C-alpha cells in the first residue's frame, strides 16, 4: 500500500538564502535516503516559506520489501571435513544467522565455496522514518547556525514544530 508522506519543519523566520539551500538539500537527501532504505516512492517535492520547510513524497510504500541475499563464505575444503561442518562453516553460518545444514556449496572461479542464503525481512516505513527525519534535519547546512535550549541541536533558527503525516 502506498500513501503520500508530508514533513513540515516549522521555524522562526529563516533567511531567504537558507530556505533555497535547505530545500535543495532536503530534496537530494530525502530521495537518496529513501532509495538506500529500499522504500519505493514517487516524486519528492519540496516547498518553503520563511517559516516552513516542507517535503512531500508521493506514493511512499508502507514497508520495505524483504531482502534475500546470497553471502559467500569460505572454500569448501576449509569449511567441511569429510562432509561434516568444521569451525569455519559453523562460524560462517552463525555470522549469517543460519543453521550450518542450510549452507550450500557452489562452484566459483576460485573453486567451490560455501554460500548462505540470508532473508532480511523488510521494516515498516514508520520505523525507518523515525530514524531518517532527525538525520535529514541535522544534515542541513547553511551559513549561520545557532543553538537554543539545552540540547545540542543546531539549525538556522529555532525549530518550533515538526509535522510528519
Name each region found by the language model:
Residues 1-165:
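Long, basic N-terminal domains or extensions that often function
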Amino acid at each position: 500500500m502506498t500513501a503520500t508522506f508530508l514533513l513540515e519543519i516549522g521555524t522562526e523566520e529563516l533567511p531567504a538564502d537558507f530556505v533555497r539551500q535547505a530545500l535543495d538539500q532536503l530534496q537530494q537527501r530525502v530521495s537518496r535516503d529513501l532509495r538506500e532504505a529500499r522504500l519505493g516512492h514517487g516524486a519528492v517535492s519540496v516547498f518553503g516559506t520563511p517559516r516552513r520547510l516542507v517535503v512531500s513524497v508521493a506514493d511512499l510504500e508502507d514497508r520495505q520489501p524483504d531482502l534475500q541475499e546470497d553471502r559467500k563464505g569460505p572454500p569448501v575444503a576449509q569449511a567441511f571435513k569429510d562432509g561434516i561442518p568444521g569451525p569455519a562453516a559453523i562460524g560462517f553460518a552463525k555470522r549469517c544467522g543460519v543453521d550450518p545444514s542450510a549452507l550450500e556449496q557452489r562452484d566459483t572461479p576460485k573453486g567451490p565455496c560455501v554460500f548462505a542464503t540470508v532473508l532480511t525481512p523488510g521494516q515498516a516505513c514508520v520505523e525507518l522514518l523515525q530514524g531518517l527525519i532527525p538525520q535529514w534535519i541535522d544534515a542541513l547546512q547553511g551559513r549561520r547556525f545557532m543553538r537554543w535550549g539545552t540540547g545540542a541541536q543546531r539549525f538556522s533558527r529555532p525549530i518550533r514544530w515538526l509535522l510528519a503525516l
